[in-house]
Amino acid sequence: MQTTTALRLYGKRDLRLETFTLPAMQDDEILARVVTDSLCLSSWKEANQGADHKKVPDDVATRPIIIGHEFCGEILAVGKKWQHKFQPGQRYVIQANLQLPDRPDCPGYSFPWIGGEATHVVIPNEVMAQDCLLTWEGDTWFEGSLVEPLSCVIGAFNANYHLQEGSYNHVMGIRPQGHTLILGGTGPMGLLAIDYALHGPINPSLLVVTDTNKPKLSYARRHYPSEPQTLIHYLDGHEASRDTLLALSGGHGFDDIFVFVPNEQLITLASSLLAPDGCLNFFAGPQDKQFSAPINFYDVHYAFTHYVGTSGGNTDDMRAAVALMQAKKVQTAKVVTHILGLNAAGETTLDLPAVGGGKKLVYTGKAFPLTPLGEIADPELAAIVARHHGIWSQEAEAYLLAHAEDITHD
């Protein structure tokens, strides 16, 4: 029997780090260890809502679930049903958005024996049956934990659409060499969107990014400059008026707009900036079920503007993310700003918006406090990070895994 230490959700803002024995692996299941999990704002929302969250079971108070859905690890044992496809020793990542036909269940939200904030998990049959367990052959564990968030961005870009000229047929994806606007776009997901817009398969000719956080804007400006095919502008959100943004587009407006903050004023602003046949993607998931905002329906009718919303990617998006990352076309390491051990994951999850910065990377088998990359106390690890220009790296990860204190199972 396998013992695990895991962060479990019991109710609203009730996260508990506990050690317990996992049930024996069945013939249609897989036993695995988790090495890394990156914290997601969706987990903060989940922890705040508890059983009110649509993916969290009603009986979570008596049947707690393991939180965390952006994880990477190693397969330890494979049940007979899946031995033709998976083997012990393989690294894996999971597409948490299972898209089950009869229920909204997802790893990290709904299951008692699987989630990213754990040392060991039992992967249920549903994950493999939905083709949501993918092998990972990247150089690092931590980049495997960033596949899922990148897949969400890929899904959003794929969901946008425009009309085929002279018809009502939809051409999926952002407009090639069009004008793209990202509002509230310097958080970790926004940075991934910038990277994907610059280095993905379809690139805009103009990319404008706004945010009200000046340090985050400076970070984005430093790490994501213009490319030959894409001119990029970064604007302080306080100064990004409609007139200013419209002028940057040459008066044309924007073909694709992504809203990364659930804010009524931003949505209304975005609506007013859509070009004819433009598409607005509401990426940010609100907690308020009554959330709404005024939009321009005159333009919906006469200018063929479109509105979409996406919540996560699918397995195809995940495979695309894996391919981009393994080919090193998208540099997801740039979004990591903090590291922590499993012991600090609960407090950090509950306080996530206030922490600031980019992605917080949990090494689930280790015990150490939440640490910004610029404040690492270990001089050798700090020197490694400095050598990589402040970016988390394979070298840094290997050092941490070899030298950080192990989490205790007690």
Curated annotation (Swiss-Prot):
> Per its Swiss-Prot or TrEMBL entry, what cofactor is needed?
Zn(2+)
Q: Does the keyword Magnesium apply?
A: no
**Membrane-spanning ranges:** none
Write the Enzyme Commission number(s) for this entry.
Answer: 1.1.1.-
Binding-site residues, NAD(+) = 221, 309-310
One Pfam family cited in the UniProt record for this chain:
ADH_N
Q: Which domain of life is it from?
A: Bacteria
Q: What is this protein called?
A: L-sorbose 1-phosphate reductase
Provenance organism: Klebsiella pneumoniae
